[in-house]
Amino acid sequence: MNTEATHDQNEALTTGARLRNAREQLGLSQQAVAERLCLKVSTVRDIEEDKAPADLASTFLRGYIRSYARLVHIPEEELLPGLEKQAPLRAAKVAPVQSFSLGKRRKKRDGWLMTFTWLVLFVVIGLSGAWWWQDHKAQQEEITTMADQSSAELNNNQSQSVPLDTSTTTDQAMATTPTSPVDTTATNTQTPAVTAPAPAVDPQQNAVVPPSQANVDTAATPAPAATTTPDGAAPLPTDQAGVTTPAVDPNALVMNFTADCWLEVTDATGKKLFSGMQRKDGNLNLTGQAPYKLKIGAPAAVQIQYQGKPVDLSRFIRTNQVARLTLNAEQSPAQ
């Protein structure tokens, strides 16, 4: 009777409870069992409480229970029927399904995150491209307007320079025409000077050829005026030299062009020293009251010297934009 009662009581106990009772009968602690089986104390505790660790497969759990049973001297055949009915096996079977659903949910969330990231990236690239295009278009429009203004000013300058050219040609014609009678009169005046020592010839010449003497006298009278015209024309180079002398000014602005370039130069008084298009291999010398304000359409096409020193335009060349700078007396360009 006692044997049957003990057998029924053992069947009523779970696997974990039977292992715990056997351990206590042998006087072993959970720490001692864990050290002998090379397990964690938490794993031994879960086995005794009939819990299936989430990170432990059912195959390993069965192996740990068998090792635990051999340690506490419980036959494995008595535990195998109970292992089939215990919750740890069912939990082990359900765990992979849960992990699969979690992985699927995580993958879906990562997909949404990646889509949002690509969307933000495309928006940033689109905004950057739109901003660059607007800036480039604005620069092109500004260069076009400046070129139109320069062409209009060139046309006005050409229309105004036509009468100036005609007046200069007429002045040159008037200046050159008196020179021929001056030379002839000079020769005529020299011939009487040679024949002057012959007193006997003078009455005959006066009596025979009075018209020639009249011509000589009339030609001799405008000779001072003719001789004064070259003297008056002689100061013209000095006037031209006076015009070019400002190039020696220490505040002179010297520009050499390696390509076609539009520019506008204004001095401190607001006077436009130059506004128009300069061609390749051209140079320009300007003088005025500092500081100078410059607006250059193609900074890479011009080399500027101010006060004998080159002006740095590299920052405008790198950005490929219209250069707006001010040259003061200390030669410190500022945009």
From Swiss-Prot:
Please describe what this protein does: Cytoskeletal protein that is involved in cell-shape control through regulation of the length of the long axis.
* Alphabetized SUPFAM superfamilies for the sequence: lambda repressor-like DNA-binding domains (SSF47413)
Spans annotated as Disordered: 148-244
Q: Which residues cross the membrane?
A: 112-132
Looking at the UniProt record for this protein, which Gene Ontology cellular component terms does it annotate, in alphabetical order? plasma membrane
Coiled-coil intervals? none
Which residue ranges are assigned to the Periplasmic compartment in the record's topology? 133-335
Query: Which compartments does it reside in?
Result: Cell inner membrane
Name the residue ranges with Low complexity bias.
165-205, 217-239
The principal localisation class reads: membrane
Report the sequence similarity comment from the record. Answer: Belongs to the RodZ family.
Q: What is this protein called?
A: Cytoskeleton protein RodZ
Cytoplasmic compartment ranges equal: 1-111
At the highest ranks, the source species' classification is: Bacteria, Pseudomonadati, Pseudomonadota, Gammaproteobacteria, Enterobacterales
